[in-house]
Curated annotation (Swiss-Prot):
This is Polyribonucleotide nucleotidyltransferase. Residues 696-741 are annotated as: Disordered. Coiled coil: none annotated. The gene is pnp. It is found in: Cytoplasm. Pfam families: KH_1, PNPase, RNase_PH, RNase_PH_C, S1. Mg(2+) binds at residues 489, 495. GO terms for cellular component: cytosol. InterPro entries: ExoRNase_PH_dom1, ExoRNase_PH_dom2, ExoRNase_PH_dom2_sf, KH_dom, KH_dom_type_1, KH_dom_type_1_sf, NA-bd_OB-fold, PNPase. Involved in mRNA degradation. Catalyzes the phosphorolysis of single-stranded polyribonucleotides processively in the 3'- to 5'-direction. Residues 625-693 form the S1 motif domain. Belongs to the polyribonucleotide nucleotidyltransferase family. It catalyses: RNA(n+1) + phosphate = RNA(n) + a ribonucleoside 5'-diphosphate. Keywords: Cytoplasm, Magnesium, Metal-binding, Nucleotidyltransferase, RNA-binding, Transferase.
Length: 741
């Protein structure tokens, strides 16, 4: 195929698609140019059906640092494992694409998106989602698309599609919505406590833009699309299915209705094992034994799936006996752990999450370096899902895509209510440990996170709660479920997570297994979620009504001091020598910003006070008129040097020692004497002159008009002292003042 180019203008930017020039051995490949962003999207499919009992779809999103004109970091100086943002983008693309393949499609499919050039004002993730759908659509892969996605911002009471970087800075909403021409099938959002009505409007506004992109894809497919390949779909033997259903359906249906999760799982497992054992014995010598037994396992899964859905849609009964809008029993507890900076334990039925708060200096913020300009991330929310939480053994190690995604969802929900850095200058980390799971563990982690933040004294604007909504639909009728459990998530059509405060929504996430849902379903789910959210907030607030006024004793305390910008180098010292010494001596952590704000962190207030005193002395400057009681550190013929503070000395000229004439300095003071002096002059070089006599009573004049003895004049000069030159803590030393008579 020769290169063909298609172009449209979308939201004020050119959207150009090139087909037939690159990656021609793949099933489908397109180059998408949106503004100055360029993404290569490639789709490939295996020739045969995979042996897995699921659809093996893999979506990758690769950020090449050269796309932004940046050099990769690290020792190897090349791209390594995907960043968190890249992982999340891959999930965003996977979620709306996956439902668009036929039931029983088991061929392995890979979709690879590579960002080749990057324009921060033209969304690379949305270009990649568009390219992924189009690469599949023009290929021979049996994909029932196309789909498209857009970003939606909300500022000045207006919605902005695919906002620029500057638009995002002022937006109250960060929404990504995807779908087909007919319906929405994926949502991901963070919001600043927006109402359900505004969120629904944003979703519908986004869907209008999606329709335009889908039309453009259909136009391209009509021009260059390949004929779809004939592939074998996984199907069970119809006669075998009818036979098993006739004998075992009622038995399995009874097991499904056992209310307690572990008991229900044991009951359904017993039925399935009985059926499987029967057919293993019956077909022990059959050459198609493996195929038959595979079909038996799939048929039993389909029977359980059908019964769960029938119970809900026809009988309006859920497997655990709840009403469709009923939440499982709730419990909230704070201070579950000693020593930590804050902790919260939240339980909803058989789902339980422990959240642990850690506060740290701002120097511990995470440095994020990707295609966007480097920035520091202050708030981290990490989510861990060990297999013991569902009573199983399994892989234990680094977090997978699901754990990363759930962690960021909680981060998005809670970030909206955190105090500003000016109000609360701490880096904040929450870790959610899922201890038990029967669905909606990500939302339990949000509730537990709220408890930990409030218990730890973080002054959040309002508590946040999360709830997961479900859907069972037969194409004509549907039922929206509140607080779905694992079985309903597994066999249902939708997982719609809604988090927020009493004022509004802070996060949304929706995944579905059908091609899309209508605005009516969205509206009902949001309204039902609001009622549930308020019920959960009642329980959270009964455990702790508002954030504590003080941090935990183990949390780092903070104090600050403002220093002149030109003194920053004094506090830091050569190669960090001075600040390192302060930290070593006091055990504190010190942050200094470019405007001279010094923040001192420690769990020991005395250590903070010591460090603050040292820093104050380092940057301290004498002022004319100040009075000090200080030691005499050096004697010269022309006067005495006294040590004011740090490395700052002052000269008390011989004429300023006493009102009467002084022949020798030693007649008045000696090294080591403590004297009280007043600063009388600071010259342009910072040299300090002080006086003792100005603080003494002035004697009355005698008959000759002199103060006591004959007043004599002397001319002498003094030089910069070196008595304290070895100290590291002095910003400056006094030089000798000019000759005085």
């Amino acid at each position: 195929m020769a290169k063909q180019t298609f172009e449209m203008t979308f939201e004020g930017r050119p959207l150009v698609v090139e087909v037939g020039q690159v990656a021609k051995q793949a099933n489908g490949a397109v180059v998408v140019r949106y503004g100055d962003t360029t993404v290569l999207s490639v789709a490939v499919m295996s020739k045969k059906m995979a042996t897995a009992d699921f659809f093996p779809l893999q979506v990758n999103y690769e950020e090449k640092m050269y796309a932004a004109g940046k050099f990769p970091g690290g020792f190897s100086k090349r791209e390594g494992r995907p960043s968190t943002d890249a992982t999340l983008t891959a999930r965003l693309i996977d979620r709306p694409i996956r439902p668009m393949f036929a039931e029983g499609f088991r061929n392995e499919v890979q979709v690879i998106n590579t960002v080749l050039s990057y324009d921060e004002n033209a969304s690379a993730p949305m270009a990649a989602m568009f390219g992924s759908s189009l690469a599949l659509s023009i290929s021979d892969i049996p994909f029932n698309g196309p789909i498209a996605g857009v970003q939606v911002a909300y500022a000045a009471e207006d919605f902005i599609i695919n906002p620029s970087a500057s638009d995002k800075e002022v937006s109250h909403l960060d929404l990504i919505v995807a779908g087909t021409k007919e319906a929405i099938n994926m949502v991901e959002a963070g919001a600043q406590e927006l109402s359900e009505d505004i969120m629904l409007q944003a979703l519908l506004k986004g869907h209008e833009a999606i329709q335009e992109l889908v039309d453009f894809q259909n136009y391209i497919v009509a021009a260059v699309g390949k004929e779809k390949a004939e592939v074998e779909l996984f199907q069970v033997n119809a006669d075998l299915k009818a036979e098993i259903e006739a004998v075992y359906y009622d038995q399995l249906a009874k097991a499904v209705q056992v209310e307690e999760k572990l008991a229900r799982e044991a009951a359904t497992k017993a039925v399935k094992e009985e059926v499987l054992a029967s057919y293993q014995e019956r077909f022990a010598e059959d050459e198609d034994k493996e195929t038959i037994l595979r079909d038996v396992v799939e048929i039993l899964e389909q029977m359980e799936h059908a019964e769960v859905r029938r119970l809900i849609t026809e009988d309006k009964v859920r497997p655990d006996g709840r009403r469709v809008d009923e939440i499982r029993p709730l419990d909230a507890e704070i201070d579950f752990l000693p020593k930590v900076h804050g902790s919260g334990l939240f339980t909803r039925g058989q789902t339980q999450a422990l959240s642990v708060l850690t506060l740290a200096p701002m120097s511990d913020t995470q440095l994020v370096d990707g295609l966007d300009p480097e920035y520091k991330k202050r708030f981290l929310h990490h989510y861990n899902f060990p297999q013991y939480s569902v009573g199983k053994t399994g892989r234990y190690g680094a977090p997978g895509r699901r754990e990363i995604g759930h962690g960021v969802l909680g981060e998005r929900a809670l970030a909206q209510v955190l105090p500003s850095v000016e109000e609360f200058p701490y880096a904040i980390r929450l870790v959610a440990e899922v201890l038990e799971s029967n669905g909606s563990s990500s939302q339990a982690s949000i509730c537990a996170g709220t408890l930990a933040l409030m218990a730890g004294g973080v002054p959040i604007k309002a508590p946040v709660a999360g709830i997961a909504m479900g859907l069972i639909s037969d194409g004509t009728n549907y039922t929206v479920l509140t607080d779905i459990q694992g079985l309903e998530d597994h066999f249902g059509d939708m997982d719609f997570k809604v988090a927020g405060t009493r004022l509004g929504i802070t996060a949304l996430q929706m995944d579905i297994k059908i091609s899309g849902i209508t605005p009516a379903i969205l509206e009902e789910a949001l309204a039902q979620a609001k009622v549930a959210r308020f019920e959960i907030l009642d329980v959270i607030e009964s455990a702790i009504a508002e954030p504590r006024s003080e941090l935990a004793p183990t949390a780092p305390k903070i104090d600050s001091i403002q220093i002149p910008v030109d003194k920053i180098k004094v506090v830091i010292g050569k190669g960090g020598e001075t600040i390192d010494k302060i930290i070593a001596e006091t055990g504190v952590t010190i942050d200094i910003d470019e405007e001279g704000l010094v923040q001192i962190f420690s769990s020991d207030q005395d250590a903070i006070d010591r460090a603050k005193t040292i820093i104050s002395d380092l940057v301290r400057e004498a002022k004319v008129g100040e009075v000090y009681t200080v030691p005499v550190v050096r004697i010269e013929k022309f006067g005495a040097f006294v040590h004011l503070f740090n490395k700052t000395d002052a000269l008390v000229h011989i004429s300023e020692l006493a009102w009467k004439h002084t022949e020798h300095v030693e007649d008045v003071v000696k090294v080591g004497d403590m004297v009280t002096v007043k600063i009388i002059k600071i010259d342009e070089k910072g040299r300090v002159d002080a006086s003792i006599k100005t603080l003494l009573p002035k004697p009355e004049k005698n008959e000759d008009g002199e103060n006591g003895e004959e007043h004599r004049h002397c001319c002498c000069s003094h030089h910069k002292p070196d008595h304290h030159s070895e100290s590291m803590e002095a910003p400056k030393k006094s030089d000798e003042s000019e000759t005085k008579e």
